[in-house]
């Protein structure tokens, strides 16, 4: 399986994003995630698999951050996951993305892991909601589309 994944990565069909343990501040050697380089290909291949909209948003965000020159990791914070830890130079940005933050369960799922990170790097939740909201803990909810076109 890994040789096939390596071949697909080498052919620029998929991107490998390693997992990073935020608490211990180290890259993990297992449980990496893979994202397709072309979201249209992903949709064509998985059209009948019931792939969720949020998974598509995550894939688009991965491609965008790589295009902007960031090194990406999937963040691990205890039992929780951060969609991406984007690193460029000495700077880090923690990113979660979701369809909406208008229900309490999603707010808990998306903001909760970010509030438990005890460093001062930028933390953001990107959603399809139209407004920018700053959470009490300094975490910004920013419109996904606005982020893609200019953020």
Ranges and model annotations:
Residues 71, 122, 138-140:
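Conserved beta-strand segments of alpha/beta enzyme cores
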Residues 35, 93-95, 124-126, 140-142:
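Hydrophobic/aromatic beta-strand patches that form the interior of the parallel beta-sheet core
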Residues 1-92:
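Accessory nucleic acid-recognition modules appended to NTPase machines
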Residues 112-121:
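Arginine/glycine-rich "motif VI" loop of SF2 helicases in the C-terminal RecA-like domain
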Residues 82-83, 103-106, 131-135:
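Short active-site-adjacent structural elements
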